[in-house]
């Protein structure tokens, strides 16, 4: 048989093949495809008979993180994304559903925070646990009533005991990057016996390569090396600078053949 190209991805830098997703619909005439072709990781409907994009399903200055379920019977896609709410930390993961025609996108996890959810088989009920680096976890049982996600709180963490022992949450901060415009998001972890009148040595825990972002976005009462170093008398900083993931392809491409950059221009 004759080989025919159905979808082609190209880039003068690199293609993030590890983030690709495809789902061929029943009948074999259309396929849902994930791509960063417009700089942001989004979902497209591909016409397999013509070998062309039929329509862009998701769009905007934000990224699809993962496709959870394709409900062909109801023509709905369930997925996670970050950066949709411009007033929130762009790395926070939220859960969404959208019609295959690109209409009626609904947020299933409306509260601010980094979310992790577990759904029942037909996605009518789910347990959602969310938190931030500063805010303790809240667990909610949710269901969809029409187009709105309704929730009932099942559990909420109590920090009174660890706070009474001297524990303090890391400080979330933002600062403009090298372009003077794009906000960089990070955390500052101080010792539990921090004295604002004293000077402390600062250690930055750095990762500024492709493929991921490592600054904690969920609640971690003990954050490994970061907490240990802080308790030894250091102030520890973590920051996801240009070259890391989930802020668009141009943001990540800074690291292309340039790992020596390590995001330093965003830190100085």
Positions of PLM-derived features:
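Short, solvent-exposed loop/turn segments at conserved positions within beta-propeller repeat blades
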Residues: 36-41, 86-91, 132-135
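A short loop-to-beta-strand structural motif that recurs across blades of beta-propeller domains
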Residues: 42-44, 94-96, 138-140
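Residue position within the beta-strands of beta-propeller blades
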Residues: 30-34, 77-81, 126-129
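Signature of short aromatic-glycine-proline-rich micro-motifs recurring in repeat-based ectodomains
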Residues: 18-29, 33
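Serine-hydrolase catalytic core recognition
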Residues: 114-268
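Beta-propeller blade termini and top-face loops
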Residues: 81, 91-94, 215-218
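Multi-bladed beta-propeller domains
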Residues: 1-20, 46-73, 82-87, 98-115, ...
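Residue-level detector of Asp-centered blade-edge/turn motifs that repeat once per structural unit
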Residues: 26-28, 71-74, 121-122
């Amino acid at each position: 048989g004759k080989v025919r190209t159905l979808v082609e991805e190209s880039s003068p830098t690199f293609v993030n093949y590890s983030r690709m997703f495809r789902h061929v619909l029943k009948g074999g005439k259309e396929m849902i495809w994930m791509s960063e072709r417009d700089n942001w990781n989004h979902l497209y409907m591909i016409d397999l008979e013509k070998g062309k994009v039929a329509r862009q399903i998701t769009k905007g200055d934000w990224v699809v993180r993962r496709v959870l379920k394709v409900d062909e019977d109801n023509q709905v896609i369930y997925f996670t994304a970050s950066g949709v709410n411009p007033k929130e930390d762009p790395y926070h993961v939220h859960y969404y559903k959208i019609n295959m025609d690109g209409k009626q996108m609904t947020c299933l996890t409306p509260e601010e925070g980094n979310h992790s959810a577990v759904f029942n088989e037909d996605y009518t009920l789910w347990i959602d646990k969310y938190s931030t680096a500063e805010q303790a976890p809240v667990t909610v049982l949710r269901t969809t009533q029409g187009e709105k996600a309704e929730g009932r709180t099942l559990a909420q963490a109590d920090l009174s005991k660890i706070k009474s022992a001297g524990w303090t949450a890391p400080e979330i901060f933002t600062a403009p990057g090298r372009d003077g415009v794009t906000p960089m998001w990070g955390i500052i972890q101080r010792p539990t016996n921090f004295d604002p009148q004293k000077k402390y040595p600062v250690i930055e825990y750095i990762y500024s390569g492709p493929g991921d972002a490592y600054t904690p976005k969920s609640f971690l009462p003990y954050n490994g090396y970061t907490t240990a170093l802080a308790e030894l008398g250091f102030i520890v900083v973590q920051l996801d600078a240009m070259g890391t993931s989930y802020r668009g392809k141009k943001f990540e491409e800074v690291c292309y053949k340039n790992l020596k950059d390590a995001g330093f221009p965003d830190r100085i």
